[in-house]
Amino acid sequence: MLKLRLKRCGRKQRAVFRIVAIDVRSRREGKDLQKVGFYDPIKNQTYLNVTAILYFLEQGAQPTGTVQDIFKKAGVFKELRPNQMKFN
């Protein structure tokens, strides 16, 4: 099963995160399938590859809670079909 989750990058006290599609059993810094976005909580910047995100969501990938909040703020779920909105 796939998840869309945050992968920590950056240095000490200056964390930035990549939003990646990754297997559920992999570690946080494990090998990802594809990078689909970027999130900087300090500068409050977000970059999302919406086409890749929609592809993985339609394939059954589940976003984590934090990633789901980021997607809601960006309006990614407005582009999904209504029957695709079931997340755990």
Curated annotation (Swiss-Prot):
SUPFAM superfamilies in alphabetical order: Ribosomal protein S16
Keywords: Chloroplast, Plastid, Ribonucleoprotein, Ribosomal protein
Superkingdom of the source species: Eukaryota
Gene Ontology CC entries for this record: chloroplast; mitochondrion; small ribosomal subunit
One annotated GO biological process: mitochondrial translation
Keyword Ribosomal protein: yes
Localization in the cell: Plastid, Chloroplast
InterPro entries assigned to the protein according to its UniProt record, in alphabetical order: Ribosomal_bS16 (IPR000307), Ribosomal_bS16_CS (IPR020592), Ribosomal_bS16_dom_sf (IPR023803)
Molecular function (Gene Ontology), one example: structural constituent of ribosome
One Pfam family matching this protein: Ribosomal_S16
Family, as annotated: Belongs to the bacterial ribosomal protein bS16 family.
Protein name: Small ribosomal subunit protein bS16c
The organism of origin for this protein: Coffea arabica (Arabian coffee)
Chain's gene name: rps16
